[in-house]
C-alpha cells in the first residue's frame, strides 16, 4: 500500500515534469521564432538599403568611368570607384544570404519547411 502511493506520487511528478518540459520547449520555440522574425525583418530592411546603395555605387562607377576615359580621373581614383562598386555588390549578396537564412530558420521552426520536402 505504501509502495503504491509512492508509485502514484512519482507518476504525478513525472507527469508534472513532462508538462513543464513541454511548456519550456514551447516558450523556447516562441522566443526563437520571435528572434528570427525580427532578424528577418531587419535583414529585409537592410537589403532594401543595400539595393539603393548599389544603385548609387553603380552610378558613381559610371561617372568615374566617363571621367577616367576623358583623362580627368587617375587610375587610383578609378580603382577606388571599382572597389566601391564591388563592396556594394558584396554587401547586397551578404544581405540576401542572411535574409534567406532567417527565412529558412522561420520555415524550419514553424514546420513550413516540410512543404519543400514533399
What does each of the following model-derived ranges do?
Residues 1-62:
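Sec/SRP-type N-terminal targeting helices
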Residues 9, 75-83:
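Short, charged, amphipathic alpha-helical segments
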Residues 12, 82, 89:
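Conserved catalytic core of two-component sensor histidine kinases
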Residues 40, 78-79, 95:
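Amphipathic alpha-helical coiled-coil/helical-bundle segments that mediate oligomerization/assembly
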